UniProtKB/Swiss-Prot annotation:
UniProt xrefs under PANTHER family: FRATAXIN, FRATAXIN, MITOCHONDRIAL
Upper lineage: Bacteria, Pseudomonadati, Pseudomonadota, Betaproteobacteria, Burkholderiales
NCBIfam families: FeS_CyaY
Name of the protein in its database record: Iron-sulfur cluster assembly protein CyaY
Family as reported in the entry's similarity comment: Belongs to the frataxin family.
GO MF entries: ferric iron binding
UniProt superkingdom: Bacteria
Example GO BP: iron-sulfur cluster assembly
Amino acid sequence: MTESEFLKQAEATLDQIEASLEDLADTSDLDVECTRSGNVLEIEFIDNGSKIIVNSQAPMQELWVAAKSGGFHFKATGTQWINTRDGAELFAALSEMVSKQGGIPVVLQDAN
């Protein structure tokens, strides 16, 4: 994948994560605030002040996630982002992380 293809896919994925979280905040008891700065998406949980950070790493062609449960690297395989350690899909993994840190079960939707 070229760098421009990676950046386009990473940008679309960050946009989708943010949109999915905003939809959940509007339709559930999930109280989060998303802040975007370039290739970094910061998800802040208002109730407890914890955060999840998702950012793209162009040199590695990966999305990195930092959460209470640890740090994770996801590599694009077709239209999905797969954890380089355990093979988990990004949106499924983020759903679990957001559920744990937010205190309510949520499912983030991937538009693909």
